[in-house]
Amino acid sequence: MIRPCDMITVAMARLIRDGDTVFHGVSSHMPMIATLLAKRLHAPNAVHLNIPGGVDPEKPVLRAYTSAGSELWDSACAVFPLMDVFDLSMRGGLDVAFLSGVQFDRQGRVNASVIGDYHRPKVRLPGGAGSAVLIPTARRA
């Protein structure tokens, strides 16, 4: 049975072009799988950057609670720290950034802070972390 999350992951993989530099954040299971799928099927020269700082990990492990496990760094062919990802993106070198969000409007703006009134929210979210830098500077986010 094909699940909606499988279809979304395949659609995300299709967005990655051969030679793209691709970054995903924390708890980004579908983007991590999409990046690995794209590298195996049609984009072998895509560069996989991840939040622990690993580049093209050889033995990625999908954990239930995070996509930022140490094996993404331990088995990487190189290390590229998170602060360098921001710099790369601001210089125009980041092709794809997969970032999470809870609410999106028609213009693509992301809400990752609160649902409801800011001072008395129904739900308080973790925040956007680097989204404010990466969304406007990555070629595709």
PLM region spans:
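N-terminal active-site beta-alpha-beta segment that forms phosphate/nucleotide-binding
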Residues: 1-75
